């Protein structure tokens, strides 16, 4: 079994829980997810099965879309609703224009510091392990891409009686939405936290494409595997090169290929090689031999 499943991860489960349950449902060990979703977050979680696990990093690298509920006037230890209250501040009126000005400032390339309650590693230990022990450590900042921030629930003024708003976030990999909520609050002069989150898109998979674990289980029991998307779906944005049988034979042996073969994709960081409409391998420019390209992954799906 090879392919990608757009799973709808339900609230209360870890991403690893989903992988564990799918291994049982699908009767296969080769199952991998494409980027962790916190347990209290629900949403699109593409799962790679069989040879598709070789593509997990490329699927993870694609953009994401979230719908978040952000609450102003209160910050928490975890930057979301699960944490203890750190600070509160009564809200004066915040107009739609003031909020939009803050959102505009946070669109584009921004720098974030990961929250203490996160899986980022510092000195070989996950940040949440330090946080649970009550230890605050210096966290490395990271640059992330925010493509768009769109308020969803109208233009009502925010105040003490109406402290929350919904926001659609289109962003690149590695963005912490919790931290974004705090940053929006800071620009407005208030403590803030992310009170709810749903991932509505991951890469090329949307909410409406997804199935729950129960639905996949039901289909498997009916011997229906139509929930599997082909591997090619995971590399839709990657440059592609159709190869002939002679090149294909070299690719199967992991051979180096001449740069001249890649003229139409020469400015790309990598290219997917397609034979008989199937993904065969992913190649990239050789780091030392300027006239050659080398295999990054050999997929061999055509032999499955």
From Swiss-Prot:
Q: Where along the chain is the active site annotated? A: 38
- CDD domains in alphabetical order: PseudoU_synth_EcTruB
Q: List S-S links within the chain.
A: none
The reactions it catalyses are: uridine(55) in tRNA = pseudouridine(55) in tRNA
Q: What is its EC number?
A: 5.4.99.25
Supply the Gene3D superfamilies for this chain: Pseudouridine synthase
What does the record list as GO biological process? mRNA pseudouridine synthesis; tRNA pseudouridine synthesis
Q: From what superkingdom does this record's organism come?
A: Bacteria
What molecular functions are annotated in GO for this chain?
RNA binding; tRNA pseudouridine(55) synthase activity
The protein's UniProt keywords, in alphabetical order, are:
Isomerase, tRNA processing
For this protein, the record's NCBIfam families field holds: TruB
Q: Which family does it belong to?
A: Belongs to the pseudouridine synthase TruB family. Type 1 subfamily.
Q: Which PANTHER family match?
A: PSEUDOURIDYLATE SYNTHASE TRUB1, TRNA-PSEUDOURIDINE SYNTHASE
Describe the function of this protein: Responsible for synthesis of pseudouridine from uracil-55 in the psi GC loop of transfer RNAs.
The protein's name in its UniProt record: tRNA pseudouridine synthase B
Q: Which organism is it from?
A: Listeria monocytogenes serotype 4b (strain F2365)
């Amino acid at each position: 079994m090879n392919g990608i499943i757009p799973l709808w991860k339900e609230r209360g489960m870890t991403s690893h829980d989903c992988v564990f349950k799918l291994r049982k449902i699908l009767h296969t060990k080769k199952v991998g997810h494409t980027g962790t979703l916190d347990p209290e977050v629900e949403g699109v979680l593409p799962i790679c099965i069989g040879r598709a696990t070789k593509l997990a990093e490329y699927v993870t690298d694609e953009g994401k879309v979230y719908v978040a509920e952000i609450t102003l006037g209160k910050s928490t230890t975890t930057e979301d609703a699960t944490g203890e209250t750190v600070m509160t501040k009564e809200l004066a009126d915040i107009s739609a224009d003031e909020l939009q000005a803050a959102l505009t400032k946070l669109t584009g390339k921004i720098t974030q510091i990961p929250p203490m309650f996160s899986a980022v590693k510092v000195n070989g230990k996950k940040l949440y392990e330090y946080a649970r022990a009550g230890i605050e450590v210096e966290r490395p900042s990271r640059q992330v891409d925010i493509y768009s921030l769109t308020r969803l629930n109208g233009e009502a003024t925010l105040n003490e009686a109406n402290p929350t708003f919904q926001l659609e976030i289109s962003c690149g990999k590695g963005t912490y939405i919790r931290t974004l909520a705090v940053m929006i609050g800071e620009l407005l002069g208030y403590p803030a936290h992310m009170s709810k989150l749903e991932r509505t898109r991951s890469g090329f998979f949307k909410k409406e494409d997804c199935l729950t674990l129960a639905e996949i289980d039901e289909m498997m029991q009916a011997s229906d595997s139509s929930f599997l998307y082909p591997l090619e779906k995971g590399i839709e944005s990657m440059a592609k090169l159709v190869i002939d049988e002679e090149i294909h034979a070299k690719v199967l042996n992991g051979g180096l290929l001449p740069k001249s073969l890649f003229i139409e994709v020469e400015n790309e960081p990598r290219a997917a090689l397609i034979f008989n409409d199937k993904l065969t391998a992913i190649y990239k420019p050789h780091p030392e031999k300027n006239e050659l390209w080398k295999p990054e992954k050999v997929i061999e799906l055509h032999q499955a």
